[in-house]
Amino acid sequence: MISAVFGKRRSLSRTLTAGTICAALISGYATMASADDGQGATGEAIIHADDHPGNWMTYGRTYSEQRYSPLDQINRSNVGNLKLAWYLDLDTNRGQEGTPLVIDGVMYATTNWSMMKAVDAATGKLLWSYDPRVPGNIADKGCCDTVNRGAAYWNGKVYFGTFDGRLIALDAKTGKLVWSVNTIPPEAELGKQRSYTVDGAPRIAKGRVIIGNGGSEFGARGFVTAFDAETGKVDWRFFTAPNPKNEPDHTASDSVLMNKAYQTWSPTGAWTRQGGGGTVWDSIVYDPVADLVYLGVGNGSPWNYKYRSEGKGDNLFLGSIVALKPETGEYVWHFQETPMDQWDFTSVQQIMTLDLPINGETRHVIVHAPKNGFFYIIDAKTGEFISGKNYVYVNWASGLDPKTGRPIYNPDALYTLTGKEWYGIPGDLGGHNFAAMAFSPKTGLVYIPAQQVPFLYTNQVGGFTPHPDSWNLGLDMNKVGIPDSPEAKQAFVKDLKGWIVAWDPQKQAEAWRVDHKGPWNGGILATGGDLLFQGLANGEFHAYDATNGSDLFHFAADSGIIAPPVTYLANGKQYVAVEVGWGGIYPFFLGGLARTSGWTVNHSRIIAFSLDGKSGPLPKQNDQGFLPVKPPAQFDSKRTDNGYFQFQTYCAACHGDNAEGAGVLPDLRWSGSIRHEDAFYNVVGRGALTAYGMDRFDGNMNPTEIEDIRQFLIKRANETYQREVDARKNADGIPEQLP
């Protein structure tokens, strides 16, 4: 039961190996092979992906990452008849962000905790499963859930990253290990924290598997590495932040970092100890037209610009798109979208290429909707800024310089320089995050899963003091994120919004939008049937008219959806599939406030639809979550303030601001361990639940500080118990976190 609570179930399905089902697998492949043969998929096959429209061979279906499929068996006229064809329960009830690949009727899906599954795409039958056995204590090395966004396929092998930093190649037919490498170089200059995780999908370009990493919230120096797809040997590496001593790393990035980037940093800021950030945790794109690899580069480490770089310089290559040669990793060009970043405005969001008519000529461009709220059009071959316009409301900048694309800052938004709080829109979660956008060549529109989640930026008082195994942002963790007063919280809740924004890139203007109940919804798929598919945080899966946003179909998936759908052919029939499971930093940190998007209890699955689906409805499940347990009546009020400080420093990022959970991980107010000092210390201090992702913290806090947290939790349980009990009596379920 405890393992299920922490979203990592130890079950029979978790123990399946390639060997136990090899015979079934081989017979299954014999029946699934088709004329749409992609089993030998390499770069040429992916370049000509539209010759194999029934497959989904790479992360964005094509190298352009447009997430458009020409399939049109399912279209506007018949999508209302869509039915559930099959579902497959997963063994991790946490956030699922993966894009499944589908090659000749076989689906390859990565799930939370870096597991890989091969599934019969027509029936949902599990063919093989691979568990890389990521250690449970790695969970607290990442900011934003133990998610995995997908895999890559090349020449009969499937590749994926693991949360503990490995890159793994498996035989696609058998699921057997071909090779495994550690992507984090032990000898490199990476900062004191060296807190790295891998949750993004690798990309393959010219026989090289390219993967990045995350970790800037703790302390990391960003880089990507290209590995030989056949052998796993390192081909090249490119760092996205300078060496703190401006010395060579003996990598492809040495020249540009030493001669161009280093000069944009203070030589003595905290970045020299923390790594500087700039991790590439999502978007890596190969463009065969320009023959370039594009990197979307992340935020600074620490976030605080004054502490990080003494308030000096643009800090290359933070918040940038960087173009490299695929064979060598040699730098070609860069465009920095957010100089002087202090808002966590990453540029790792999906990079898309397309051919766009501009001023009477067709240009090959990058279109990009990063966190900072602006929609950029950039020349894909040269990095020249063409145009930019905000696709959501922003208050940190009044616009972009029309010639250079540099932001025109609101002086008040430079909170690390003013020393004053800043209520930023968008906040750190961005106007657009990891949820994939799509483009339809039929409508000419880009469809952005946009959102508004403000953030209260407050400087850390007394200078920057990093903590091991904790977020090191240079901000006051007791005040950031969510306002304290009831009135401010009411206003904050009203500011939580989510939409599909249909954006016309030629006009740099919104065409129309679809309003959602709140933010943190799933990615978008566009199809030749003039449809958009998207799952929502409230557990509904929708199909919309791509021309005007009309809602044409919806299905109750019972759990929030943050992953993007895919579509494919199996036995000549079109299917639409998506991974189901809500998670990530929004419900982790915002906790009770995240419930405004709609309450669901996680039951992670893959679900697939067809026009003649016969699976029937999903099994009914508990929709109220764990019932509150009446807490102990007594607590030491003298200890709760320090308990709050320790909780916000070490616990809130997973268990919710002010100790209110959103249903993904345990809500500690109702944990039985808070009733007993020894039991609580065994979990928090000694790591009794390390195998399930709850690491030990006796190296970070002493027993007195851990007990202070327990006293704080008892206080919060008493303050909120009756409200939570009453809420479960209401038809609307559990309310948002409000006094």
Swiss-Prot record:
Annotated cofactor note:
Binds 1 PQQ group per subunit.
Catalytic residues identified in the record: 344 (proton acceptor)
Q: Subunit structure, briefly?
A: The alcohol dehydrogenase multicomponent enzyme system is composed of a dehydrogenase subunit I (AdhA) and a cytochrome c subunit II (AdhB).
Keyword Phosphoprotein listed: no
Annotated residues that bind Ca(2+) are located at 217, 299, 344
Record-level GO cellular component terms: outer membrane-bounded periplasmic space; plasma membrane
Give the UniProt keywords, A-Z. Calcium, Cell membrane, Disulfide bond, Electron transport, Heme, Iron, Membrane, Metal-binding, Oxidoreductase, PQQ, Respiratory chain, Signal, Transport
Q: Its family?
A: Belongs to the bacterial PQQ dehydrogenase family.
- E.C. number(s) listed in UniProt: 1.1.5.5
Q: What does this protein do?
A: Dehydrogenase component of the alcohol dehydrogenase multicomponent enzyme system which is involved in the production of acetic acid and in the ethanol oxidase respiratory chain. Quinohemoprotein alcohol dehydrogenase (ADH) catalyzes the oxidation of ethanol to acetaldehyde by transferring electrons to the ubiquinone embedded in the membrane phospholipids. The electrons transfer from ethanol to membranous ubiquinone occurs from pyrroloquinoline quinone (PQQ) to one heme c in subunit I (AdhA), and finally to two heme c in subunit II (AdhB).
What SMART domains does its record include? PQQ
Classification lineage: Bacteria, Pseudomonadati, Pseudomonadota, Alphaproteobacteria, Acetobacterales
Write down what this protein is called: Alcohol dehydrogenase (quinone), dehydrogenase subunit
Reactions it catalyzes: ethanol + a ubiquinone = a ubiquinol + acetaldehyde
Protein's cellular compartments: Cell membrane
Membrane-spanning segments: none
As for membrane topology, the entry says: Peripheral membrane protein
